[in-house]
């Protein structure tokens, strides 16, 4: 296996028309209880919002999957998660979400870096998956859903 097949470095961004503090709360919601798959079904994710907190999928009846831990949480500008994520094989992942106040709203930048025996299917689908997360955050503020949760 070549080194380039064993590494991943993906960056995506979205602009959200809302205040940075509100968007940060929206990020926490979408990475936790508000996490859905592209079909809109709940991913049953839990995000413990403190350094060292777990990020995991709780399917009930003792069934679950640890996606990672909160490495850094610095409201309202930074959330870093590290762990196996959705990869049930030898791999290390780091996801960084940076928020920046811009004219008219907030820019959310996501960077996912990984190293390990990366599955080709995961490599191909990662961009779509994170795009879904970011698009949901943007849509929450575009249609007022996030304001209703606050």
Region spans (language model):
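Short acidic N-proximal helix/loop "leader" segments that mark the beginning
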Residues: 1-11
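Short beta-edge strand/loop motif at the mouth of beta-sheet-based domains
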Residues: 11-12, 18, 22, 29-66, ...
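Hydrophobic pocket/interface hotspot
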Residues: 23-27, 55, 70, 81, ...
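A short small-residue
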Residues: 6-8, 110-117
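Residues at helix-coil transition
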Residues: 28-32, 75, 135, 139-143
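A conserved amphipathic terminal alpha-helix motif
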Residues: 114-150
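Conserved beta-strand segments that form the floor/walls of ligand-binding pockets within enzyme
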Residues: 9, 15, 80, 98, ...
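Hydrophobic-ligand binding "helix-grip"
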Residues: 45-47, 56, 60-103, 113-116
